[in-house]
Amino acid sequence: MKKVYAGATRDRKEFRFHRNLFKDLMQHLQAYGLRTSNMDIVDKPPTEPLRVTFPVNEDVVPRDYQVGLIDFLGDFSLRTKVTNLQTGKGKTLSALMAMVKIGMRTAIQLRGGYVSRWIDDLEGLFSFKKGDILVIRGRDALLSLINMAKADDLQAKVIIITNKTLYKLFEEFEKDGSDNYYGIRPEELYDLLRAGLRIVDEVHEDYHLSFRTDIYSNVSSSIHLSATLDTEDVFRRQMYDIALPQQYWYKGVEYDKYIQSYAMFYATTSESLSKLKLSERGQDSYSHGAYEKSILRQKVLKDTYLEICRYPIQRFYIENDWQGGQKCIVFCYLVEFCVVLRDYLRGIYPELNIREFVAETDEKVLKEADIIVSTIKSAGTAQDIPDLKVSVLTQAVRKKEANIQTLGRLRKLKRWPNVTPVFVYLNNTSIETHTKYHEAKKEIFQGKVLSQREEHIPLRL
């Protein structure tokens, strides 16, 4: 399904384009004989936002390298601000300290799965009173928020709104126009809320929605957070350049290299290779899901592959001066395979707490487990895993953003400052696609890791 980076009502009486395309739109219309002298062009400034104070806890002190970023994000004269700060360097804290600097009611836009983490951060940084934070999830909750604002009964300083909730607002407006369920036009929302600042978390994940939020909102200032806005997708890069032009990116923090990367090679016998599926039925492109499914269907292959997956865990996590409290995460593709690998590892390491982390899993697993088995979709982005020493990527993945986000789960080990976090990815040298992905990773990780090493696993699939 194609995504259109514009908006229109179903009756086609209204069309919406990003404000940064205004000059291009005017030139386009004039090329078709439509003169600006025959147009009514209205520049509507946002309503005066509600000024508020945020009670910062006394022990909250930004790091030296965050000070310049906070000043940049807190510049209210800039309508759009972007930070592509690497994971673990405090994007959330920097954005919230900029919020303090701006001192206006703030709306935070994010995926529903990140709400609890943001609430934890807000409550850890500020001494909020009951009612200062409001979470809006679902159409009924949004309608209640709108009605509170209309009745001048809105007290919250921070309003958290999930992406899907905003999506429904835009969808229903495009279908029903002004006569919609919510009783407002989308561009009236921030004016009604008197929110002067919008913070968008992990903007790269639901970028189409974030783009559409821009064309359907009239907010004074926005802060966009991500660690992976660097993309090789040409079209996506063009869309980034429209809504998030490079001149609005903060580039004052040098990349901190503290991870050691290992490519772990293994090979497959010709007999086994003939039994492996490398693509889904009817498709030509490589599918790691098909690869794992074909392995799970054959006991000998499954047993060997499970041991291949265990090898880097034993090598870098268990044998490399393991200490209680240190964690390891393993990324697979299929949830089914996560469960199978979890059970296999439990049989070998009964003394360790080994858990899977997939959809609907409680986030406390990330804090309690010694070894976590997960997927890139579940734990590869925006998850903070304390004391993570080793990350093992079993899935062959090419996409630049996925590789950087997965690498970024590793943070400096505060409790063991002399221990270097290790990132391992498996690579089947008998499969051409895996080899190409390995070459791509070498380029992607250049300048982002201490060094890139290669080792061979003494097992054949």
Q: PLM ranges: what are they?
A:
Residues 281-330, 340-343:
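Conserved interdomain hinge at the start of the Helicase C-terminal
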Residues 324, 329-358:
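Conserved helicase motor "Helicase C" RecA-like lobe of SF1/SF2 P-loop NTPases
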Residues 194-197, 202-263:
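Post-DEXD/H (motif II) to motif III coupling segment of the RecA-like Helicase ATP-binding lobe
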Residues 355-444:
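Conserved RecA-like P-loop NTPase helicase motor core
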Residues 41-82:
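Conserved pre-motif I regulatory segment
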Residues 87-126, 333-338:
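Conserved Walker A/P-loop ATP-binding site and its immediately adjacent core
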Residues 113-143, 344-352:
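Conserved helix-turn-beta segment of the N-terminal RecA-like "Helicase ATP-binding" lobe
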Residues 152-174, 367-381:
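Conserved two-lobed SF2 helicase motor
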